[in-house]
Amino acid sequence: VRDRIDEAFMLPNVPASGIQRIRGIEGQSGRLTGEAEWKRTIITDGGLVITPLLAFQADADYFNASSASLQAIDDMAAARGLTADTRSSFARFMATAGLELRWPVLFTGPGSSHIVEPTAQLFVRPNETYVGGLAVPNEDAQSFVFDATTLFERDKFSGYDRIEGGTRANVGLRYSGSYGNGWTTNALFGQSYQVGGVNSFAQPDFVNAGADSGLETARSDNVGLAGFSTPGGFSASLGGRFDEQTLAMRRSEGKAAYSGLPVSVSARYTFIQAQPSYGVPEDLQELSFGRSARLAENWRIFGSGTYDLEKNFFTGDGFGFAYDDECFSYTMTLSQSRNRDTRELTQSIGFNISFRTLGDFGSTTGSFAQ
């Protein structure tokens, strides 16, 4: 059960853009989710790798919001010419039949080997339900990024509150190389197509997840990634999302990291073109960094920070500690973030307990805990 009290429900507009969004509700919402997946890999005599897939997800949701939150939902729906379909409870399901084809081709040379792998996927499923009328209280799928790392995901949403529906094809070309001196290289380039049904990423929800993402049209933006790693623990990569027609840069990201003992550090530069409907009214440039230090065999501390290069201030930072052994892990994090427009400070605490053979529960406040 989630119980969120968020002042954002009183202010559904993003001040800088005028686009209505609802980042949280006052009240209670809960969801019970069950998911199952079956897949099998078949390799033909010609080297073609065929992977059929079947998946099923079922949810039971309830929603009990305050009158002010319900009014904010009605206002957002009216602004988009919709009728709010708010429900106190509902059930939904998504069944998927998928097929993936990969054809890895190996090339070898003096001191190196290279694999080029054309890949195609097709996922057939019904349309997503309860999204056109803002019925789903989207809380755990608000964060959304479409790039090369998510191109071949069956469901590209970041959480369970949204479920990708409709028939979609993903195509791309993978490359990996290894060298005698221990270096490795990798690259990926591809595109996604909505070939049938309703495009989930073009449907409204509380935060407009999917809007201006590069997936809201029938033919997605192009995404690419290239990187390398060294035997000394250093790695770097460059990735980007490019307009499907003009190839103009929509998003880019550069990463560099060093992983060693006892210290690991990383840095990342990100450019995001304005996404007004998603709450980014102007171009965004950020510099993020992270560090981790192992204090003993099972204990480590870590931290991260993000600096806004456009407005010249830290938008977020945090730190934490973790314990890991062969059967149990525990993570505690403390973080704070600042609104880019108002500089309002939000602080949070998160934890996660994981049993290797049983599962995990809790929530961490950021990816720097990884």
Regions found by a protein language model. Name each.
Residues V1-Q370:
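Outer-membrane beta-barrel proteins and related beta-barrel translocases across Gram-negative bacteria
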